């Protein structure tokens, strides 16, 4: 069986029309960029971005921070290359293929003043452990800022399945309560909840958009529906309005200035 991370990376490798369909990701990137601009980062901050994709977040934050050393990383070599093509002429940015859940850096790379991620950490297999690893790469006083998806995301698609006695292949996103309860080395985060709704022309358009942004990877235990069953689900989805919710949670974790954490 192909490992989940390999399937996810492969999905993003094939997401050639990502920019045309990732509307929600773009909106949240703009919001994250405004929050980054408001942080007291100081001169020449070192920034690590996890899951850079095609560069939405860096583009939204461009020009707002002076003297930045911004390391853009992604698990997908194709996405890293697209970001490199977009920003490669700038001395501000560097690029690397990295599994954000298991980051491996030379000692000279860390610590970072800011670690950020837009719509990336929900792919982690163990979210709290993965975030804790990132948190430990921060300097004292540094910030971990990220957006992720919560329970309720694509609820309309799941409801269309459940109404017919089927199970959708969408991942089981954590509840808001589970996310807010996470402590990284004992540190509590500041969380904000938001819900964005996208309406599609039809069910095929919705599924095409998911594949285009690399989000069509089903959960590992999902058994695909027959063609006839899928047509029933698509019809039900369209009858309900062909809308899909994105339940977005944005978090800010500050590493204490006090003695180094374990």
List each language-model region with its residue ranges.
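N-terminal, positively charged/glycine-rich alpha-helical extensions of SAM-dependent methyltransferases
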Residues: 1-16
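Conserved alpha-helix/loop element of class I SAM-dependent methyltransferases that forms part
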Residues: 23-43
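Conserved Class I S-adenosyl-L-methionine
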Residues: 24, 54-56, 190-262
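Class I SAM-dependent methyltransferase SAM/SAH-binding core
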Residues: 46-104
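A short acidic, Gly/Pro-enriched loop at the edge of an enzyme's catalytic core
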Residues: 104-115
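A short SAM/SAH-binding and catalytic strip from SAM-dependent methyltransferases
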Residues: 113-126
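A short glycine-rich, Lys/Arg-flanked "PGG" loop and its adjoining helix->strand segment in the class I
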Residues: 128-140
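Conserved catalytic/acceptor-binding region of the Class I
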Residues: 141-203, 216-226
